[in-house]
C-alpha cells in the first residue's frame, strides 16, 4: 500500500513533473501465462470468489479484495488482471490468483507477466477551450461533443490517448510504463494552458 501514499505527501520532482501535477494511476491491466490448461467449470465450482457463465463469456471471472482486482482466467491458462492502482499491486494480485489456481490442483506457473495498459488521470484545475484545441491540433484530435463530451487526443510520442474534458479533467490511457503517462501529460500541459478558458 505504500505506493499509493507517495504522490500526495512527497514534494513533486520538478524535473520529472515541471507542471507540478502528477497524474494518479487509476487502473493497471496486466497479463500472465499460467502455462497449463485449466478446467474452468471445476475452478468456478471450487473457488468461492469466481463466476463462470460460458454462454456469456469464455473465462472465469475471479475477484480478490486485496489488492482490489478482477481476473479473467481462460482455459488456455492465459490470465488478465485489472483494477490494481500500481504496477507492483498488479503483479501481487496476479500472483495471488495464480496461487488460488495452484491450490485447486492445477500446475500453474507464472510466465511472461506483462503490464498491458496503465490508465491515469489528473485535474489541471482550469477550464479548457476544446473547440480551439481541436481546431489547431486537428491531426491528433477528435472532438464530437454530441457523441462524447471529451476531446480525444492521440499523442504519437509517447503513444498515449488522452481524454480532455472542458472542466480540466484529463484521462491518459495506453501506457506500458508509468513514465509514459507522466511524459504525455507534461507534453500536453503547455497546450492546455494555451487553450485555457477565460473565466467570466
From Swiss-Prot:
Residues in the signal sequence: none
Sequence repeats (start-end): 25-101, 115-192
BP GO annotations: DNA-templated transcription initiation
Subcellular location per the Swiss-Prot or TrEMBL entry: Nucleus
Chief subcellular location: nucleus
Record GO cellular component, one term: nucleus
PROSITE patterns in the cross-refs: TFIID
UniProt keyword list: DNA-binding, Nucleus, Repeat, Transcription
An example molecular function term from Gene Ontology annotations: DNA binding
CDD domains in UniProt: TBP_eukaryotes
Entry keyword Acetylation: no
Assembly notes: Belongs to the TFIID complex together with the TBP-associated factors (TAFs). Binds DNA as monomer.
Similarity remark: Belongs to the TBP family.
Its job: General transcription factor that functions at the core of the DNA-binding multiprotein factor TFIID. Binding of TFIID to the TATA box is the initial transcriptional step of the pre-initiation complex (PIC), playing a role in the activation of eukaryotic genes transcribed by RNA polymerase II.
Name the UniProt record assigns to this protein: TATA-box-binding protein
